[in-house]
Amino acid sequence: MDSLTIFREIIRRNELGGDLSHAYRFSDPDGVRSGKSGWSFGLCQFDVANNPSAVLCLRECQFTTDEILGLKRQDVDIVPLNRKLACNTRTVDRWDDRQLFECLTHASEVCRASGIRFASDEVLFHLADYHNQFYLSRGGKMHQFLLGVGRPVTAQDILIFKLGLAWGKKRPDDVHRRFSNIRNVWVENFA
């Protein structure tokens, strides 16, 4: 199985709890309409407020500027917009595929350019999942952590880093769930 197909399955489990039907309706990423994020959609859970690709995808799906602003602010009637999104599954899938490919490519390129090696190919999927959630920036916290490991990076190293984040301290169960999903998909395809 190719890396993109494997990563698609990882993201399906991590972002949608395994239920692909959730990709075609809007969800509140933090569950409390905190204002930190807008509504999210797609397999990759594009955050309308923080991901420019989300807006481009919605424009291609014929969402109006007012609808997109309402999704960003989370102050719009979501029911008709869910119907509109569900009519554009092929467009959403195409943007998801771009995002998945970009996550794998970006994580690989950042590490390769910095001389960071992986103890196994599984590590790339953990980093790509991190990138889909947070963005793996050159010189950022994760990148600095990886540079400091001083040996080939393991999946366990990524887990330890994530558990040290505010999200990891607040939701260690979610960090472990995501880690287990990645590990399980990896084992299902390569064991």
Where are these regions (language model features)?
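Cell-wall polysaccharide-cleaving catalytic domain and substrate-binding groove, primarily
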Residues: 1-117, 122-191
